Amino acid sequence: MNAQKPLELILARNLLSSIPTPAFLVGEKGELVFYNEAAGALVGRRFEETGKLSAEEWTTEFGPFDENEQPIPYLQNPATTAVRENRPYHGNFRICAAGGNHQDIAASTIPIVGPGGSSGAIVIFWAVNEGGKPA
């Protein structure tokens, strides 16, 4: 039987479903809980195809990747550190986009904190070119 999701995650998912900017929702343990249609278009797979993924699964498949094209482990990602400290984070990353091509992105991470403490994070991202400008 599935445990009830925190209300703040349910509301965050509803918000992400209604915005045109690529975004995903990460749960308290780093699992990929949801990503919207715009994110699915960028990575080449709809959320309905992947479903919920563990932190290890989604970082291996989608990234972020380092300069040698190796996945950055979830716990070594600076955005993860910030969220665990209930701080927002913004940075540039490389992900695996549609067709297996790597794409540079800018990403902003916002922690979600409810009555019971941290529930996860919202990550909003967009493609950027080599100069860091939106692509």
Regions of interest found by a model, annotated:
Residues 90-94, 104-107, 122:
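PAS/PAC sensory module
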Residues 11, 50-97:
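Terminal output helix/cap of sensory domains in signal transduction proteins
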Residues 2-31:
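Sensory modules in modular signal-transduction proteins
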Residues 29, 33, 37-41, 47:
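PAS/LOV sensory domain surfaces, especially short acidic/polar patches at coil-to-helix junctions
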Residues 74, 102-104, 120:
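Beta-strand residues that line the small-molecule/cofactor-binding core
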Residues 29, 68, 99, 115-116:
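Residue-level recognition of short loop/turn positions
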Residues 2, 111-135:
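Sensory coupling linkers of modular signal transduction proteins
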Residues 25, 64, 95, 111-112:
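Hydrophobic beta-strand positions
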